Amino acid sequence: MDLCQKNETDLENAENNEIQFTEETEPTYTCPDGKSEKNHVYCLLDVSDITLEQDEKAKEFIIGTGWEEAVQGWGRTSPAACIWPRKIPKKARVGEGACSDCLVCVNLSHWSLQTKPPTEGGPEKDQSSPSQTQAAPQGPSTASRAISDICFPTYFRAEKKSLQIKEFIWCNKDWAIPGTNRGKASGNPSGGAHRGLSIPGPLTSRALLVLPPLKASLSNALDVLGKKSKNSFLQSEEKVLDVEKDGCVAYAYGLKTADGKGEKRASELAKHPMVNDTPSSPSPAAQISLLTDPEQRCLHWSLLSEKNLACPPDPSNVRYLAALQLLQKRGVQSYKSKFKAKEPRSPVITRKHVLPKAKQENRPQMLETKVFPRPVLPSLTVSRVIIPVSTHRIL
């Protein structure tokens, strides 16, 4: 038994020695003097004090608006909470403030309580007067009422709505029957809530003078538009008819001066339907301007055939036409006789002389057939043919 106990004690001692040996081998950071730890703590405290002083100095130069706290979420108040859109607050209780979140409203409430004297006036002043007179016994309730009045003042919204509706209905009645409504408005006694809403008589007369009724204005506007469209259409038709009538008058005038057949053609012009429908006659200035210049009045007679002539020519032009017709007949005959007389005199006919003669014979026919359906311009064709062609070369 003793041996067993001795072995156990030896084992326990050995274990204790091993533990002590490991503890001795671990590095110890203890200093001989404890001043270093204290100095370190003091340094940290000094740094914190310096930072606090710097922060306080910075806050002194910056006006505190509360925006930093509102953005970072450190505070529960904002400088202009009443400006932001939010729900309409409920009625404040006796011990609660209606706008406790708004710093501006709190400052205004304190200032209003100090400066405003108790006065009696309208319904708003009647409500604020008992809160100011009973400021000593009921401190929190008066402050809350003043704050609520500043942030969200009560404007008697029911009366405001009734004012708008009453004005609207009254205006409609005035437009329909102005005389009866004026009598009703002057005769009906107004209530206490609507004493300031009674409308005088001159205002209604001014409104009626300035603003016409809507139905009449719409009908007048439509009539004016219809008249404008009709006038524009009639003016365009009159212009067309005047131009046609001017042309026809010029044509009739030319017929009478040109030939004796003008009477027959003038009767045909009288049957024209458009001239008979015209209500107004053309101005004399337009007739003079059309009849003075014969070139402007109609195209040149030599460029068109007799059937297609729009206006007859002057007497001088008629004489010239007759002369040209005579020249045409005589010129062709003389040309043929001269050409036949010259043919036997030519001793030798070469190919060079035959080709231009054949061309000369074919030229007037081509001009007459292709360019002019009838020989209206013989002078142009004959002038090229009548020139005698010498068969012998001149040395």
Curated annotation (Swiss-Prot):
The gene is C16orf46. GO terms for cellular component: cytosol; nucleoplasm. Residues 115-144 are annotated as: Disordered. PANTHER family: CHROMOSOME 16 OPEN READING FRAME 46. This is Uncharacterized protein C16orf46. Signal peptide: none annotated. It holds the Pfam family DUF4529. It comes from the Eukaryota. InterPro entries: DUF4529. Residues 128-141 have a biased composition (Low complexity).
